[in-house]
Amino acid sequence: METVGVLCARARVEEKSLMAALAAAGIVSAIFPPVDEPLPVGPLAIAPSGNPFPVPRLVIDRHQDRQIARAVLASCRALGVPALSAGVAATGDRLDVASALAAHGLPRPHSALCTSEEAALKAVRFSGLPATLMPLDMKSGGIALLDQDTAEAVLEHRAVLGGSERSLGLIQAGAPTAHQRAEIIVIDGRATALEPGSDLACGPVERRMAEEAARALRADLVAVTVARIGSEPIVWDVHPAPDFRDAMPIAVLTVAEAVAHAVAQRLRTMDAASLAQDLGSWIAITPEGVHDDIVIRA
């Protein structure tokens, strides 16, 4: 099926505008995976029902449920279907993201992984207040810990709820307000738009930092939160499937148009690679075939 799949549960305003931009670029798209079709497990494109599975050429990750997104992206990899996604942020958690950004040398707030209430309180005392509790799952926002009473109440509440999901988290130094941060959407390596509510002045330094963060995460489509708590900007957080209905374009293209442009480029690259492979096979076979087929008769 020569179709680009838009990975989502339903088409919201963002996905509808994205599919319209793809159509304007001459690219057929559809919601993926089909709601009524189970996905195959493994490299064969045969659904568990026995029917051929509608495999798209490329998938755009827009799913708001990151657990479902990770599972579907894994299935796509098994089928050999590339994805336009947030890279490490699409398939990992905040610890994976923080580790990748730190390994790349990008400026980040002091962070500590905590596995218990006691460890989190110790991390808060070490980093100082205010601080922010960042759940490991990408779908949950950070919780500002503005004073000691708030920190103890929040961490105790999570401990009482129980479970490893509630116990695990990152404590990050600082708690930037709206006017101290900017949400920059990076598409195919370029800062493309600002999410609404981004009050921090977004200059060349912030845009370059967001682009560098996207490269560190191997992300094609991601929102990077750049914060300025002190004198220098830092990478605060990322969002693998950002809302962009009210996003303000930095240049000419809207987010939907920029994604459609990136998809068109990716499809052209895939076509060129496929053609080169076919030509290579033809060149490798032809000389032997020509010599074998020549017959000289007296």
Residues of each region from the PLM?
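Rossmann-like NAD(P)H-binding beta-loop-alpha module
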Residues: 109-131
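ATP-grasp fold ATP-binding core
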Residues: 98-102, 124-145, 163-177
